[in-house]
Amino acid sequence: MVLSGDFPLGTDIKSIFQIEDTVFEVDNKSLTNRPDLWGHYGIAREFSALTGRPLRSVETADCAAYAELPPVEIDARDTELLYRYTSVKLRNIKQKVSPVNMRIRLFYCGVRAINLLTDLTNYIMLELGQPMHAFDLRRISSVSVRRFEEPFEFQTLDGVKRSIDPATLMICTGDTPVAIAGVMGGLDSEIEDDTDACLVESANFDGVSVRKTSSRLGLRTDASMRYEKILDPELTMLAAGRFIKLATDIDSGVEVVSSVTDCYVRRYAPVVIDFDKPFVDRYTGIDLSAAQIEKTLLSLGFTVETDSSRFTVGVPSWRATKDVTIRADIIEEITRIYGYDNFAVSTTKSALSPVRPTAAASDENDAKNLLVERFGLHEIHSYLWCDAKRWKEIGLPIEDNVRIVNSINPEQVCLRNSMIPTLLACVSDNKLYAPEFGIFEIAKVIDGRKPDGTCNERKRLGIALFSRIAEEKTLYFRLRDMLACLGRTLRHEAFTFEHTGAEHAWQHPKNTVSVSFRGTALGSMSALHPLNRNLIDKKAAVVFAEIDMDALSLLDGSEIAYAAPSKFPGIDIDLTFTAAMDVPYAELEAAWKALECEFLAGVRLVGIYESGDSNAVTVRFTFVSEEKTLTRAEVTPYIDAIVAALDEKGIRVRTQ
């Protein structure tokens, strides 16, 4: 190693190069929302305000000195996503390697040194927080900022060919793209070993656009992370001047061959905030002097005009993009510089009033408690987006689902429109861990779009039961009892079940019923279609239900009428009906509901047994009187009426 200067033997190399460094560990939770703190100079500004020490200004070249030189040709075609574009051309760059001290600093910041021009852009980005880019001047003579109407492929600096869509803002020379605005440059215009002239870009782009582009391409860079925070547009000229200053200091032969051309397309409106001292006293809880308030704000770069106890504060450009916009933000600045540890500890005094849960919230909590505590179901939590691959594995369609435009995972490209496929996927994942289990979830689905184009969000309850022990019919009626109990719990009246055909491909063509309450459709209950069941476990039974909780929350329940239990014993009579396999239980139920009996206290399904091509359905009728002990003869007329009504429909009563 050849050193410039005369150093005595034994001189510690640490005193020659900036190898030793001081590291400040800053526990700053607000860094994400402070674009000015994404550069060392912004942190230095904070230290200056906290310690009261003066802040040194950044050494830059006088950009006005080059005003007579030819400008860089900048065509700002897209004035929506471009805020400001500053550019300058440099030639006669002989030195290719950055100074040792610069390379050491870059290393300490986790950045690999490449060459002088690239290192300068990275150094200034770390120093000021302003991303920059240097193009080889042999491949770019003018600048055009635009979007393309048709998609195309573009190879970035990392050598990857990326698909560019019409929403992506590009930097071009003429009509040839050379960089993805705010994200990464192109391979064809990168700085090479023999590059001796460059065009420097210092720009400000729309932060939301950069974030979407970065997410869409799966390409997150140091530059894109800073642009996402909505940078100060005033930084572009400062960074350009800093680049010229460092380049000419390091390589004295560097020539600036253009003016520092500044295309300021969109300006932020100045932010001015008015407040008075009583406002500060009320929100801080301490009595700060007007002079102390003014000194604090001035140290942070704010401009302050005072009139007695009133303040008119101008927010500096590096805080005005999204950070400081209202009076409460000023209070935060004053209190954090004053020091939160300097506030006296006091008990908070505030009026507390009970919060009454909404009907929807009460329904959700009551439903969860019932399903977990009484029926032993497991609550799951799943994502709103669905895994297309998993849905296809269990034979579920996704053609009608709302699509995600910029999905990060290529398999998760749509949003679910039903809870059932999510539950079935969970059943498939857990089928090997238990021979029998039940799961449920209350969550949102996207049921198409509203007339205005927005997504139609609905909150639904999904339940799924799985068993390799119980038969499908047993599991089916177990779920039916759960839903009936749910209706009585939430609205003091059981839901109504009516046999219907399958509406979805995964529903059983015969074992599917609609669920309603007083004529309002709430959802459906079904066994899993045999074809879909084979994809999960052909030896197991799977049943499921889906209830629209939003629709239920709009319905009022029955009034709870208290009735003292009778002091006289009741009579239980079991009847077994023989019906064809395709006769639903609701048809039997309609027979006794149509008859009036003052003694009938309850009806319960005891069991269903298959016998050849028919079902044997056992039902228990309970009769109770408030005035006396009933005899069999007193309830026989009602039993005979039920038998006669069902006999007309071809449903017989078994006598043995």
PLM regions: where:
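RNA/tRNA-interacting regions in translation and RNA-turnover enzymes
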Residues: M1-Y340, A344-A360
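Short beta-strands and strand-coil junctions in structured, solvent-facing domains, enriched
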Residues: T32-R34, L187-D188, G207-V208, A320-T321, ...
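Polyanion/phosphate-binding surface patch
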Residues: V210, V405, P435, I439-K473, ...
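A conserved active-site cap/scaffold subdomain adjacent to cofactor or substrate pockets
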Residues: R226-A240, R460-G487
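Glycine-rich, charged/polar anion/phosphate-binding loops
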Residues: P8-D12, V72-D75, F154-D158, I180-D188, ...
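A carboxyl-terminal module marker
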Residues: S299-F302, T306, T312, T454-N456, ...
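Extended, well-folded interaction surfaces typified by the phenylalanyl-tRNA synthetase beta subunit core
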Residues: G42, I273-K277, D281-F440, T622-V624, ...
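Flexible, glycine/charged-enriched surface loops at secondary-structure junctions
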Residues: G52-A64, A113-T118, A247-T261, E305-S308, ...
